[in-house]
A protein has these predicted regions:
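Charged, often Cys/His-bearing segments associated with DNA-binding zinc-finger transcription factors
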Residues: 1-32, 83
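Short, amphipathic alpha-helical "recognition" segments used to contact nucleic acids or chromatin
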Residues: 37-51
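Short, well-ordered secondary-structure "scaffold" segments embedded in the functional core
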Residues: 57, 61-74, 78-254
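Ser/Thr-centered flexible coil motifs
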Residues: 11, 37, 198-200
Length: 254
């Protein structure tokens, strides 16, 4: 196997942040000596998540076994996901910030699937995956991500399962969303349906899209972490993985 030097498009701040989390965790649990120190473990995890390199590739690059690599990654992802904001915390923060509205959007994390995995097949995206709900600010900064549900689950149903609609109403926060959320209630504003709309509805539709567009960039930010472009681990871990990446993305953005 050949080796080469490569750049990782992340700041040293993010590396230091994750290293600190791992260092404190090792001290708390009284871990014995490990092959990689906290900084090296943090770098390994960031390479895997950001670049999407396989366990075999990462393990070879850091000179450790595949099983150890997997344990290092799972440990870091679990610790990061615990720091992800809860829905009520995210909504309180949005309220304090005074955002005029939020943006709710669903995304699909692709997984390796076969014909027998029908519950994971998304008719909307025409592929197997896990449904994740994302709340973002008007400028596209992700605020909160949900757990994962099979890809066949409709966005509106997913929003109800995670209690998003009820919490938005309780917080009295207006939220913009696409047509997949028709019927979500008065606090979730969606575009008009149908082709032959009057001029007033067409104008409202265009204004809605203009406001919603920047907010939907939150999903693009999360999926800039290439591990989310096709998940090869257990699909049930998708939600935790996205929450961990949310924490890293917010750290990277400063």
């Amino acid at each position: 196997m050949l080796f080469y030097r490569a750049a990782l498009p992340l700041s040293s701040r993010t590396l230091s942040y994750l290293s600190g989390i791992l260092r404190r965790h090792r001290k708390t649990i009284g871990t014995p000596w490990r092959r990689l120190n906290p900084g090296q473990q943090a770098l390994l995890v960031l390479v895997h998540l950001r670049k999407g390199e396989t366990l075999t590739e990462v393990a070879a690059g850091f000179g450790i076994g595949i099983a150890t690599t997997w344990r290092y990654i799972r440990e870091a992802v679990t610790l990061l996901a615990r720091r992800s904001p809860r829905l009520d915390q995210a909504l309180r923060a949005a309220k304090r910030a005074g955002y005029p509205y939020l943006v709710l959007d669903g995304t699909l994390i692709p997984i390796e699937g076969v014909a027998a995995d029908r519950p994971y097949y998304s008719g909307k995206h025409k592929k197997h995956g896990m449904n994740i709900q994302v709340l973002a600010t008007p400028d596209g900064t992700p605020l909160w991500t949900s757990g994962s549900l099979p890809g066949s689950v409709h966005d509106l149903k997913a929003a109800r399962i995670w209690g998003i609609l009820r919490r938005l109403q309780a917080a009295d926060l207006v939220t913009l969303a696409d047509k997949g959320y028709v019927g979500a209630g008065e606090h979730v504003r969606v575009p008009y349906k149908g082709r032959d709309k009057p001029a007033s509805q067409k104008a409202a539709h265009a204004a809605h899209a203009k406001l919603r567009g920047p907010g939907e960039r939150a999903n693009a930010q999360l999926q800039s972490w290439r591990i989310l472009r096709k998940l090869r681990s257990c699909p049930l871990l998708a939600g935790q993985l996205v929450k961990a990446i949310l924490v890293l993305q917010l750290c990277e953005a400063g």
